[in-house]
Amino acid sequence: MKLLHIDSSILGDSSASRHVSAAAVAQFRKKDPSVEVISLDLASDPLPHLDVEALSWLGKDLTPDVSGRPELIAGANALKDFKAADIVVIGVPMYNLSIPSQLKAWIDRIMVAGQTFRYTSGGGIEGLAKGKKVVLAVARGGLYGEGSPAASFEHQLSYLKSVFAMIGITDLTVIEAEGLATNGGADRARILSDAEQKASAL
């Protein structure tokens, strides 16, 4: 079994999403010590954002004349590792109502027509990445959940749910550490501990 572990927070060891994603990965390792973990830190080793050339190579085998280009290799490997993974664990902080741009750059490498989804003759979309389990370790400073005053501003989790639904993922687990900065951060430790416990119970 292969597990792809992705972190996207720029905050290093002080990142809530990193703590929760690490707890989830530790639990999967505990349940199956033979699991092969591939780690991708999009903060310390970011993928470049798409340009015209990178777009033209999405989902294609690199030819010898470009096979030495690090940015193209990184994009090809991102898609390869995602397709090979049985489980994907992603640490996702909220930045300015949405996801980090580093994570968006990764998504742009794995959402590839003909590889992870296809357009049907009737104008619909069929996901081709079925059968994977995805765990989202979501961290937010404020309260953006359903029923909260700021719910309409939330474009983090709702966006990711759409992304993974489009490519055929139906086994999606969300672990939220929300409200980390409310009350001056007084509840941060408790909120983070609760989220880590949920991750450890996967």
UniProtKB/Swiss-Prot annotation:
Homodimer. The keyword Protein transport does not apply. The keyword Transmembrane helix does not apply. Its cofactor is FMN. SUPFAM superfamilies: Flavoproteins. PANTHER family: FMN-DEPENDENT NADH-AZOREDUCTASE 1, FMN-DEPENDENT NADH:QUINONE OXIDOREDUCTASE. Binds 1 FMN per subunit. Signal peptide: none annotated. This is FMN-dependent NADH:quinone oxidoreductase. Belongs to the azoreductase type 1 family. FMN binds at S9, S15, A16, S17, M94, Y95, N96, L97. It comes from the Bacteria. Coiled coil: none annotated. It comes from Gluconobacter oxydans (strain 621H). InterPro entries: Flavodoxin_fold (IPR003680), Flavoprotein-like_sf (IPR029039), FMN-dep_NADH:Q_OxRdtase_AzoR1 (IPR050104), NADH:quinone_OxRdtase_FMN_depd (IPR023048). Quinone reductase that provides resistance to thiol-specific stress caused by electrophilic quinones.
